[in-house]
Amino acid sequence: MQKIRRDDEVIVIAGKDKGKRGKVLKVLADDRLVVGGVNLIKRHTKPNPMLGQQGGIVEKEAPLHVSNVAIFNTETSKADRVGFKVEDGKKIRVFKSTQKPVQA
């Protein structure tokens, strides 16, 4: 079970975008994740009339390493860590500071 999943609210704790918040759009296999509106890069693309794509400079999100983000606890409005608890035979994710379940 992963500590950070898709649609979790995270905050960047290290790097050029430190302090920015966003939702996890995609979790990649090599401990990286794509966060909406964070770590934006510019890509120069050629037009492709067969696909109907316009050329130009496109801004898109680049992957961040999972160690540079922390899950955001909306109850305390701070970054938090994730732990696991077994309830009714199911493993659930909980915030370390409040021991309350993480709502995705």
Curated annotation (Swiss-Prot):
GO terms for biological process: translation. It holds the Pfam family KOW. SMART domains: KOW. GO terms for molecular function: rRNA binding; structural constituent of ribosome. GO terms for cellular component: ribonucleoprotein complex; ribosome. Keywords: Ribonucleoprotein, Ribosomal protein, RNA-binding, rRNA-binding. One of two assembly initiator proteins, it binds directly to the 5'-end of the 23S rRNA, where it nucleates assembly of the 50S subunit. One of the proteins that surrounds the polypeptide exit tunnel on the outside of the subunit. Part of the 50S ribosomal subunit. Belongs to the universal ribosomal protein uL24 family. This is Large ribosomal subunit protein uL24. It comes from Pseudomonas paraeruginosa (strain DSM 24068 / PA7) (Pseudomonas aeruginosa (strain PA7)). The lineage of its organism: Bacteria, Pseudomonadati, Pseudomonadota, Gammaproteobacteria, Pseudomonadales. The gene is rplX.
